[in-house]
Structure formats: C-alpha cells, structure tokens
Amino acid sequence: RMKKIKSLEHKAGIWLDQETAYIVHMEGDAVGKVEGLISDVESRARMAGEGKVYARFGHTFLDNQEKTQHRQNNQRKSFFKEILGHLHGVNFLYLFGPGKARYGLHHLIEKDQQLAGHVVAFEAADRMNKREAVAATLAYFTGDQFKQYKKDRRKALKAAL
C-alpha cells in the first residue's frame, strides 16, 4: 500500500495598513520567503494640502475630493488584488494590522474562489516592521489558537461526512 506523503501546509501571514503589506510565507513550521508590497494609495496629507486652492469655490473642491476618493478606492483595490496575486496555493491565511485595510482585503479574499474560507484569524495589530510581522506570523501559526482551529476544523469535516 502506498504511504501517504504528508505535504507541508502552505501558510501565510499578512500584515497590512493602507500603504504597506508584508506577506510572510510558511511551509510547515518554517518561514519561507517574506514579501513587502507598497501601495500607490495617496496619503491623506496631500489631500489636506489641496484644500487651500479650492476653498474659494466650494463645489469644485467637493468634486475634486470625490475624484480623489474614487481614485484612492481604485488604488486600494488594485493593491489588494496585487496582494492576492502572491497567495496562490496558500491553505491558511492570518490577516493582521492596524486600521481598516484588513477589512477590505478580507472582503476581497472571501470573493476569490481559490482563497475563500482560508482566513483562519483576523486581528487588530500595531504598526510593525518586516521583522515584527515575521515574528507575529510565526507566533500565530505555531501557537495554540491555530492548533485549536485545526482541531475544530477536523471535527467539522468529520461531522460533514
């Protein structure tokens, strides 16, 4: 009888805010490659600066604000799509970071046929550099919370049979 080869699970931790994402890949319990992506989303600062010019003509300012908003949303979406492009073949995803960006990414992941249902944890986290993002990913995937998640998932799969 053939012995089943246990393939290593491909896991990824994604730390992100509006401008940056770190994607930490793991095979089994080992950290593989770590990718840093930077978004094209314009920062708020530039928007604030634009205000002075348009203050005199209120409606023009609003139009411009709407355009900027629209452009930012499109840029954000393409940033999330770029992140998704780095997640092929990932079995388990851990999303963490400050602010709202992770909600947008989570939403897009759940609409993706290959990745929907693969997010195992979704947490608020502080600003981090790459090294800290690696440490947090490692801590999550080697910790009890993830072990418990897998135990529960096995039970659920058995129950479904």
Predicted regions and their residues:
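Terminal alpha-helical anchor/extension segments at protein ends
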Residues: R1-L161
